[in-house]
């Protein structure tokens, strides 16, 4: 008995007690009930063995559907071992036969206690069924224990009356076998696979569905170590005991139940991936659930069954463990393998048809588009208008929730439906844009090319052309991108607004290739002089941008012209270019609040399913704003800063490098730079930004010669593009610092003076202050000190976001004062620099200020008092765990600390970091993940 699961042991003990009473002359009918596969036969065999061990004779029969047409087939099985029966003549009359069987049975039982064991009595022929019922009325004073097993399971088809339907409860003892509990099932799995992992055991338990038959069949198929993970399809199982057991389980339930079970399995397939496990912050789960009452009606309609019976079956199967409710409350199969086994043998065409029928029925019932669309993903084309509408609505909802993979899948499925060319063009443009952004497939550009070849509305054709041009330029094919836009431009001679859109996009995309850029900007500037009305406000904004980078205008003039352009009536097609260009120039002009407002306004107008060059441009400006403010920790916390898929340098990688250096991770910055492949990088402005950033990282780690090479190469490339202003990459002052470190001050002074001249043209505190500071370091002496003091004065009155430059200027002034022997003033400057750097979290600047303080003769501080560098190792560890979303209790358990200790450390960390809420931790700790 110890080998039996607990659910069987209780029944076996009860049967043993009843057998003892029968041996004492108090017979009874015991009905052992249970669902298919719950072990009725196993328990009955145990009772037979126990009875024989106690000297009881045993008569047994196993009923079968084949016996239904043979009168007394079950009784004849029982009587076969009885010697007296062989001598009796059976005339075939029911009443005579029944009396004869009872007489022979009583005679046989007089000699010794008797156990009559009938398995699957619900399958007995009608005559035997009546005889067993009548016999049960007369065994209470005989030494006979009549034990019958009966299937007791809720089926869609109403069952026939059971054995005890007409018997008094006093004559019957009913035992019901419950399904296996998760613990009992896990014990059975571990008894066969002692070394199995917890997840493997859990998969087996769920696939076994609380059913001993299914669980043992599964364990037979899994064998000894053949499957490191539990499969999700029956095809992976050998020899196939599990799917055979599931098939038998379904057959036992009848055709109606089988149809309902398969209909639910088809629906269940469509629910896979219904919603992501984690959604972006602030996004709620989509309304994908089908209400339970509607689900029963839906399945009933698909299977041609009674909705009330279907609802009861769903409830019963959930109780047995075959089904489990998901997070939306829908009953689903306990494991994908069980669901697949239910569908085994169903042809693929029938399954696809079932999904189509399910989708149509759901649509008619008003189920959410997402749920309908997931059924359509598994169906053949339907050809009805509602199909494409439901799929597109589901795609829109997925995009709203940030589930771009789902949106792309829905759009792919939509394209399989019959569509007009114009409709297909729009969908191909959206899908191609999503696939290009995903980087997981190369289908994006071919789809966009196909979209452009289809006839459609002019504005849709322009959208397709801009999307294709953006994709081509992003892959380094700038010439092809501009050619695409020009080709479409030639076809739209009567649409001046759309032509301006294409021309503006050509100008922006040309930034990715120096030769194309020169040609396009020459045309743009000529057009601005000859026919300014032709290029529109966005074109004029690009002219302002070009003049700014060429060092031809001041920041004040640039912003004045751009604000005037922004005040003019907007062209919806070109407005994104105007806003994005104005945002970039505002950031260069240190008008950071205005730049930030423009970025947010521009991003609101961008569609996630439509490639547009301004989307990437606006994202770059947002990163530039964070860097300008010295918010390096926030930059490193951005999702793109931790994206391991990016292997070529870009503006974002440049910001990661600069932020790592600023936060004291110089060695890590160099390793990151070396991990990127510059050979495959397009010859674009982004490569130049990266070369500058790599130079900063090399200089910070002592590779001055390597840094100088990067700065000069950056300058050569920028000059070739007519980008001479230091507003983008101040390579001259960076190279000057390297020249100075290499002992070539005259060359350093020349570079610094050249940049100062260009900086005074742009005339913002950041650019002028930086040039003055480097020129001061290169010049030295009294003149150098005067230049450093001028830089500090200028930067003290600068707009917000220039504090990192002020810190550098204070360090330069402090070093100059130390060299001049004015150590008191030097220490004051350097202490201010250290305090400002500490508040900013600028670890490298703080270290430089501390080093300069030491050179001035001041006592070095032991450590930072605020900022992320001030955290102790314990505080940082706890803060990082909290930033990852762990609760105080979880942190305490993980680190074996008291919860109060965790709370104390977090309170101290908040104070040092200058924050007030747990949600701010990830932004200030400044981790770049894999990078």
Question: For the regions a protein language model found, what residue spans apply to each?
Answer:
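Short secondary-structure boundary elements
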Residues: 38, 184-409, 413
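Helix-turn-helix DNA-binding segment
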Residues: 825-828, 854, 859-931
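Conserved phosphate-binding/catalytic loops and adjacent sensor/switch elements of nucleotide-binding enzymes
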Residues: 38, 42-114, 123
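Extended alpha-helical scaffolding segments used for macromolecular assembly and cargo binding
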Residues: 29, 43-47, 312-313, 332-333, ...
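Amphipathic alpha-helical segments of tetratricopeptide repeats
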Residues: 319, 396, 412-416, 449-453, ...
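Internal alpha-solenoid helical repeat scaffolds
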Residues: 49-54, 166-167, 199, 205, ...
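Alpha-helical sensor/transducer elements of the RecA-like P-loop NTPase core
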Residues: 127, 138-203, 207, 214-217, ...
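Alpha-solenoid helical repeat architecture
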Residues: 27, 70, 255, 274, ...
